[in-house]
């Protein structure tokens, strides 16, 4: 147990003030051998982690219960007309696409497109698939399952082979 969270990438990270001072000293003295290790760290170490980014629930939530199968996905950036749900070869496909349009700040444009595919369990009845989009932008897709292998229980009798007469057993031993 530790008192502080350990992140192996912290070895390469420094505070903005430390980076400023190190860069100032490095530029002043320009001694390549004294460069800190963070200056040679790979570029991807300075990228924000996925949990720090505001990318929403990109994977969705899959609910696979005994009698139903459901998928919930956050599609709040899309209008209902920009979404499609289909089933292809036991695969549930959710697709969203909106064409390029100017962003709200007016500095550029935004175009979004995604495809999410989920393999349907064998028990899912494709005819019962329904979808619903909430007012908060959560798409819920539900389907019923058929009962698989539900047979009544029964006792299976054990058949024992007949005992051999004792006379035959003695002759076999000799």
Curated annotation (Swiss-Prot):
UniProt entry keywords in alphabetical sequence:
Stress response
Q: Which domain of life is it from?
A: Eukaryota
Is the keyword ATP-binding assigned to this protein?
no
Q: Give the matching CDD domains.
A: metazoan_ACD (cd06526)
What Gene3D superfamilies does this protein's entry cite?
2.60.40.790
Q: List GO BP terms, alphabetically.
A: protein refolding; response to heat
* Ranges for domain sHSP: 50-161
Single Gene Ontology MF annotation? unfolded protein binding
Disordered: region residues? 153-174
Would you indicate the residue range of the signal peptide? none
Q: Where is the composition biased (Basic and acidic residues)?
A: 161-174
> GO CC: one term?
nucleus
**Record keywords: Coiled coil included?**
no
Family that this chain belongs to: Belongs to the small heat shock protein (HSP20) family.
The record's annotation in PANTHER family points to:
HEAT SHOCK PROTEIN 22-RELATED, HEAT SHOCK PROTEIN HSP-12.2-RELATED
Kindly provide the name given to this protein in its UniProt entry. Answer: Small heat shock protein OV25-1
Q: Which organism is it from?
A: Onchocerca volvulus
Q: Which gene encodes it?
A: OV25-1
């Amino acid at each position: 147990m530790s008192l502080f969270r350990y992140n192996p990438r912290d070895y390469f990270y420094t505070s903005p003030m430390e980076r400023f001072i190190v860069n100032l000293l490095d530029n002043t003295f320009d001694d390549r051998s004294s460069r800190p290790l963070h200056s040679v760290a790979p570029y991807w170490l300075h990228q924000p982690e996925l949990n720090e980014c505001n990318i929403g629930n990109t994977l969705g939530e899959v609910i696979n219960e005994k009698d139903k199968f459901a998928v919930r996905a956050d599609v709040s950036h899309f209008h209902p007309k920009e979404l499609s749900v289909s089933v292809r070869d036991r695969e549930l496909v959710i697709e969203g696409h909106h064409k390029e349009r100017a962003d709200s700040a007016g500095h550029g444009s935004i175009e979004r497109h995604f495809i999410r595919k989920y393999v349907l369990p064998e028990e899912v009845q494709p005819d019962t698939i329904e979808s619903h989009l909430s007012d908060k932008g959560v798409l819920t897709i539900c389907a019923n399952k058929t009962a698989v292998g539900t047979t009544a229980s029964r006792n299976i009798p054990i058949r024992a082979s007949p005992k051999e007469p004792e006379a035959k057993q003695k002759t076999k031993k000799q």
